[in-house]
């Protein structure tokens, strides 16, 4: 149970834990919500870059380059890469080999 719902009280020269309301539905719901919030926060921090790109650009796929000359494909690829790497006025320079 959550540390916030536990109360330590002196019992017979010892420190014990008295959790009278641990079966209260509100306490159980709050604990579950707290655990889910913590898990989602950790996942957000771990996958921040992926989440940011997903919400900013959606699930858009690049246009088909069938029948397009290689020089135009390369220019399009650079434009798409620069659009993805732009993060709130922070520009990332990537050299393609």
Swiss-Prot record:
Topological domains annotated Intravirion: 44-97
Topology in membrane: Single-pass type III membrane protein
Pfam families listed in its UniProt record: Flu_M2
Glycosylation site residues: 20
Record field: transmembrane: 23-43
Ranges per topology, Virion surface: 1-22
Compositional bias (Basic and acidic residues): 71-80
Location(s), subcellular: Virion membrane; Host apical cell membrane
InterPro entries attached to this UniProt entry: Flu_M2
Modified sites of kind Phosphoserine: 64, 82, 93
Annotated keywords: Disulfide bond, Glycoprotein, Host cell membrane, Host membrane, Host-virus interaction, Hydrogen ion transport, Inhibition of host autophagy by virus, Ion channel, Ion transport, Lipoprotein, Membrane, Palmitate, Phosphoprotein, Signal-anchor, Transmembrane, Transmembrane helix, Transport, Viral ion channel, Virion
Domain of life, per lineage: Viruses
Free-text activity regulation comment from the record: The M2 protein from most influenza A strains is inhibited by amantadine and rimantadine, resulting in viral uncoating incapacity. Emergence of amantadine-resistant variants is usually rapid.
Disordered as annotated region, ranges: 62-89
GO BP annotation list: protein complex oligomerization; symbiont genome entry into host cell via pore formation in plasma membrane; symbiont-mediated suppression of host autophagy
GO cellular component assignments: host cell plasma membrane; membrane; virion membrane
Site feature: Essential for channel activity, possibly by being protonated during channel activation, and by forming the channel gate and the selective filter: 37
Residues with site note (Seems to be involved in pH gating): 41
GO molecular function: monoatomic ion channel activity; proton transmembrane transporter activity
Further facts: When the channel is activated, one or more imidazole moieties of His-37 probably become bi-protonated.
HAMAP family with a match to the protein in the record: INFV_M2
Self-association state and partner proteins as the record states: Homotetramer; composed of two disulfide-linked dimers held together by non-covalent interactions. May interact with matrix protein 1.
Full protein name: Matrix protein 2
Organism: Influenza A virus (strain A/Leningrad/134/17/1957 H2N2)
Lineage: Viruses, Riboviria, Orthornavirae, Negarnaviricota, Polyploviricotina
Gene: M
């Amino acid at each position: 149970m959550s540390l916030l719902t536990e109360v330590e009280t002196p019992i017979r020269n010892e420190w014990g834990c008295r959790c009278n309301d641990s079966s209260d539905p509100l306490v159980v719901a709050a604990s579950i919500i707290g655990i889910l919030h913590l898990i989602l926060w950790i996942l957000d921090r771990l996958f921040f870059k992926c989440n940011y790109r997903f919400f900013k650009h959606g699930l858009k796929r690049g246009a088909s380059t069938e029948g397009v000359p290689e020089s135009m494909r390369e220019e399009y690829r650079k434009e798409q890469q620069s659009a993805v790497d732009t993060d709130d006025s922070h520009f990332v320079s990537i050299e393609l080999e």
